[in-house]
Amino acid sequence: EINAPLSEYGGPSGWNDPDMLVVGIGGKSMSIGYESEGCTHEQYKSHFALWCMMASPLLCGNDVRSMNDSTLQVLLDRDLIAINQDVLGKQAERSIRADHYDIWVKPLADGRKAVACFNRADTPRTIELNSKTVEDLSLEQVYSLDSRSMENAANNIMVDLAPYQCKVYICGKPKK
């Protein structure tokens, strides 16, 4: 949320840094002004996905000496790290801010777009992804980071999101 208005300032000459990743910290926290039970695994995955979309520095806030397998799985996601480290260096911009979800779009150096659909609600949600919801979006080729496979998308994709889930897609054909 804090990075949303800063996209024009982020890039190869300077990176917007919203602080450290909370993936794997676990346990109770008072950092939000009241005691909470911490994040679920799905929330950690969403946090990391959005962080990567922002091209933010990947600084771990957890104890890296004692990471469990699920934390490692999140933090070592090659596809998300590739989006974060894309040489174009652009930060994602919020394309849609609806009542309970966001759509973020990050241009990539090869001409494709990384698109993140994030459910901010504590209830499941289905959103439609197409050229009306994201300007100039090509669905000619769509790679889902969630399923690690190509999606069949004629004119749209119906994105089913669990509470607080973020799904990321790479859309379009790479430019040669």
Regions found by a protein language model. Name each.
Residues 1-62:
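Glycan-recognition surfaces
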Residues 28, 58, 65, 88, ...:
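Short, glycine-/Ser/Thr-/acidic-enriched flexible segments
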Residues 29-30, 60-61, 67-70, 122-125, ...:
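Flexible loop/turn segments at secondary-structure boundaries
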Residues 37-40, 101-105, 156-157:
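Generic recognition of flexible, low-complexity loop/linker segments
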Residues 46-95:
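Catalytic cores of secreted or luminal carbohydrate-active enzymes
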Residues 51-54, 59-61, 97-134, 164:
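Carbohydrate-binding surface patches
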Residues 132-147:
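Solvent-exposed beta-hairpin/edge-strand motifs
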Residues 152-176:
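C-terminal beta-strand-rich structural cap/linker in extracellular carbohydrate-active enzymes
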